[in-house]
Amino acid sequence: VLAAQGVQIKVHYPECCGMPMLEQGNIEKVSESAERIAESFVSFIEQGYDVIALTSSCALMMKYEWPLILPENKSIKLLSENAFDIDEYIVDISKNEGLVDGMKPVDGGISLHLACHSRAQNMGAKSNELLKLIPDADISIVERCSGHGGTFGVLSPTHELARKVGKPAARQVAKSNPSYVVSS
């Protein structure tokens, strides 16, 4: 989608954003990672590139969590001001420049789970706006906790609780009987 829009792309993934470490309370490791990652993006930002996170968790870390953890770090501040969630970025392009022709309808309904890490960015339901760009899209929205919570849903001590928390969201998805299930 970005290439079709004429966006010049450079892929740069130095390492994990550290969300799993943050969820485990390891602020020291998150800080170390944040400093390394932010510094690695400075030259791209200085060349005029925006930084686009492909997951809402990573966008949340770069835009909000890292600046709270290391508020005096200039590289982190610069990155936070130039980082975007992928949905947010494409929706902004569509509003400001329009999208190239060629978007085709999908066969069947779409169930969209608005992830907590997406909602925490206070940017609105950009993933819903993005999906609405698909002609004739039939979208049902799930605004309930999935219970996953990063590592919370997969760790043995909390797995059953996570399943219990996520059941209402799963039921809502099943009820809409979609062809596609996506999460922001």
Go through the PLM ranges and name each one:
Residues 1-184:
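Iron-sulfur cluster-binding electron-transfer modules in prokaryotic oxidoreductases
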